[in-house]
């Protein structure tokens, strides 16, 4: 229904009710029926039925990620090497078939916030020449029973359909904050997101590694200890990769990446700055460079000096 049609209907209904009351009709049953009908239609539309907008469509179509490679991610050499080794199982399909190796279904990235887990998932899609589909765990949590499970099915279906449409042999499905839906299940207590987790487990068990397009699940969390044991067992998330805070060499690498588009003066020592930022994550180091540029602009300086960054 168009916007004008809805406005006309909203204006017409009260006038009709007033007219019926004026004629002496009892409009209470009519109003009650209308409220019940509206409630049913609203619930069905929220669950994607009756031609309503589906949950995945309300969230918006997944967009291709920006160009991202492992070289664009500063530091994390150990984590990147572990991830590349796992991704080779997706690329070298003929070799792993020859040796009877069971390909991976899932990779779990763990570590503190801001260490580049999402960036590594995007780089994985580029490394394997795969379609990239992403979602956050919070998108699956709803007050309506069954909505989360439906969204899980839609997500897997979208990954496969997009890979087929774009002519790709594989798809990388990234779920951030998986602890929201993958938390430990408590006996006796039934929660809506228990159904969502059960559906995720069912979909992962249904991944046939010989099928095309092949599907790889990458999930990220900073609370690994909260995850249900059924989710992290072998055969589902086979590889657990720790993405930890960068060391000094990694911090300097990250600072160099984020300083490429900034006019640094010759006095700036990124090595010194890397030593001063012990315990900083990649996101915090990016913020340091950004704040330094803001201070330089505030001082109306031509370049960013060491004092703006320290």
List where the protein language model places each region.
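N-terminal accessory segments that target, anchor, or regulate ATP-driven/P-loop NTPase machines
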Residues: 1-57
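Glycine-centered secondary-structure boundary/capping sites
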Residues: 23-25, 75, 167-168, 300
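Hydrophobic residues in alpha-helical segments
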Residues: 31-34, 47, 90, 163, ...
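Walker A/P-loop NTP-binding motif of AAA+ ATPase domains
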Residues: 60-274, 279-280, 292
């Amino acid at each position: 229904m168009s916007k004008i049609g809805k406005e006309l209907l909203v204006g017409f209904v009260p006038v009709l009710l007033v007219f019926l009351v004026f004629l002496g009709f009892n409009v209470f049953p009519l109003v009650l029926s209308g409220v019940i009908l509206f409630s049913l239609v609203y619930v069905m539309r929220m669950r994607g039925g009756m031609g309503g907008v589906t949950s995945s469509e309300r969230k918006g179509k997944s967009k291709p990620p920006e160009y991202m490679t492992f070289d664009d991610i500063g530091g994390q050499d150990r984590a990147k090497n572990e991830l590349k080794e796992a991704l080779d199982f997706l690329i070298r399909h003929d070799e792993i078939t020859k040796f009877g190796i069971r390909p991976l279904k899932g990779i779990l990235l763990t570590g503190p916030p801001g260490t580049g887990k999402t960036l590594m998932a995007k780089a994985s899609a580029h490394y394997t020449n795969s379609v990239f589909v992403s979602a956050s765990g919070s998108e699956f949590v709803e007050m309506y029973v069954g909505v989360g499970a439906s969204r899980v099915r839609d997500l897997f279906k979208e990954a496969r359909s997009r890979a087929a449409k774009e002519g790709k042999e594989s798809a990388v499905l990234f779920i951030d904050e998986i602890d929201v839906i993958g938390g430990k299940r408590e006996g006796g207590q039934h929660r809506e997101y228990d159904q969502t987790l059960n559906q995720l487990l069912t979909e992962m068990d249904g991944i046939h590694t010989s099928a095309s397009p092949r599907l790889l699940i990458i999930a990220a969390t900073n609370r690994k200890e909260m995850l249900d044991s059924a989710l992290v067992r072998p055969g589902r998330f086979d590889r657990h990769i720790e993405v930890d805070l960068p060391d000094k060499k990694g911090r300097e690498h990250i600072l160099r990446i984020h300083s490429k588009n900034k006019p640094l003066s010759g006095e700036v020592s990124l090595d010194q700055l890397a030593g001063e930022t012990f315990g900083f994550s990649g996101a915090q180091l990016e913020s340091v460079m950004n704040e330094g540029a803001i201070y330089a602009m505030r001082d109306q300086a031509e370049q960013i000096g060491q004092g703006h960054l320290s």
